[in-house]
């Protein structure tokens, strides 16, 4: 692998969510400061649920998590600790709301460990949130980073661009993080028995195969099967990053909620098909509760099918070039059907990158090096041409 200044490293665009990619994201900052993380904003569980119910906004938890993963190593630990700090999971709601209001004061002890400029910016954004906090807001286990992002998003008229730009500079984020769409939607699934699930947090308890995956404006808890599917447009900023990508990666992570959900907005499949760069899938190793009953080959087929719903004229070779896996240490449902994957025109690339003593997890350093090496190899063999550059517009992400 060529050794480059990270500032000149390749633009790797990930469809991602959750925490599975956190380690690899962190490791990648040693090699490139130009990775782009298109994050799913559809989470409906935990403290995200309280924010979404109160303000009807996209979920910000996965965005917060990825910003922290890409933060420069020289950022004071006290800043990251505050960013990731949570209120207690138990306790009286009014007492916890009072605690939050007290933290809005410049004299509160929570700000003392932080550099003054960083403390000021964070306190201002907490103030934006407190100005709008409903009297019945449920603050249990609330993440401070989530509250700051929500406050900025609301202050800037529901525009992610200013608040993400500001906190990316504050944390010296070595990459780009943005939601795949700016819309308050929920993930839904029609199961094989005809039942319907609404809400990402329900996907960890799938009892039937998923027949159809879609987005909806309906909130979790709705039991009617008459749900209205919604296909929001891919943001123009995300589309431009895809257009100018040095590589596109469908990485490890919960199959439906972290990977496929990002492919549902209108325009994603077409943008991927048009991008002139390597396109790589890194499947999960070990058990993914969301992908029960799906072999590795079936996962590849489902990935392609969701992309082709938006780009029906695209063939497999327009959407996916290689599957990057570890046959020695990895554990893949149904095994590795080499010939079946190659019959689809997809190259199977074998690299040691799964932890030998823990097949559930990839070694972040080995996985990042394997990915970067594969991108270089595909370019060198002219498997796909290298993308050019593009100016990224400033717009409502």
Task: Enumerate the language-model features and the residues they cover.
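Conserved catalytic alpha/beta core of Sir2/sirtuin-type deacylases, generalized to analogous enzyme cores
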Residues: 1-12, 19-37, 45-46, 146-249, ...
């Amino acid at each position: 692998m060529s050794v480059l200044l990270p500032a000149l490293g390749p633009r790797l665009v990930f469809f991602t969510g959750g925490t599975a990619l956190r380690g690899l994201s962190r490791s990648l900052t040693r090699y490139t400061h130009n990775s782009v993380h298109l994050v799913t904003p559809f989470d409906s569980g935990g403290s995200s649920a309280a924010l979404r119910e109160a303000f009807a906004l996209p979920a910000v938890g996965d965005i917060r998590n990825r910003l922290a993963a890409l933060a420069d190593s020289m950022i004071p630990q006290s800043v990251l600790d505050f960013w990731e700090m949570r209120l207690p999971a138990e306790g009286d709601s009014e007492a916890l709301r009072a605690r939050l209001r007290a933290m809005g004061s410049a004299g509160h002890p929570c700000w003392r460990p932080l550099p003054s400029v960083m403390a000021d910016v964070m306190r201002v954004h907490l103030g934006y949130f407190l100005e709008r906090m409903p009297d019945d807001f449920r603050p249990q286990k609330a993440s401070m980073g989530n509250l700051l992002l929500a406050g900025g998003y609301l202050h800037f008229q529901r525009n992610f661009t200013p608040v993400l730009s500001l906190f990316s500079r504050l944390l010296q984020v070595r990459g780009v993080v943005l939601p795949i769409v700016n819309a308050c939607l929920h993930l839904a699934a029609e199961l094989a028995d005809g039942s319907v699930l609404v809400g990402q947090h329900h996907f960890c308890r799938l009892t039937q195969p998923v027949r159809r995956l879609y987005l909806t404006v309906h909130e979790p808890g709705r039991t009617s099967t008459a749900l209205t599917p919604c296909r929001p447009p891919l943001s123009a900023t995300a589309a431009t990053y895809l257009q100018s990508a040095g590589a596109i990666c469908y990485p490890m992570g919960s199959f439906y909620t972290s990977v496929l959900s990002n492919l549902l907005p209108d325009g994603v499949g077409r943008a991927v098909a048009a991008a002139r760069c390597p396109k790589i899938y890194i499947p999960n190793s070990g058990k993914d509760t969301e992908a029960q009953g799906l072999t590795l080959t079936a996962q590849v087929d489902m990935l392609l099918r969701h992309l082709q719903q938006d780009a029906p004229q695209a063939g497999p070779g327009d959407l996916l070039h290689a599957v990057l896996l570890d046959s020695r240490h990895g554990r893949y449902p149904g095994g590795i059907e080499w010939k079946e994957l190659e019959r689809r025109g997809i190259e199977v690339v074998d690299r040691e990158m799964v932890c030998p003593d823990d097949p559930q997890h990839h070694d972040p350093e080995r996985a990042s090096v394997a990915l970067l090496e594969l991108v270089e190899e595909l370019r060198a063999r002219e498997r796909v041409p290298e993308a050019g550059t593009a100016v990224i517009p400033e717009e409502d992400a």
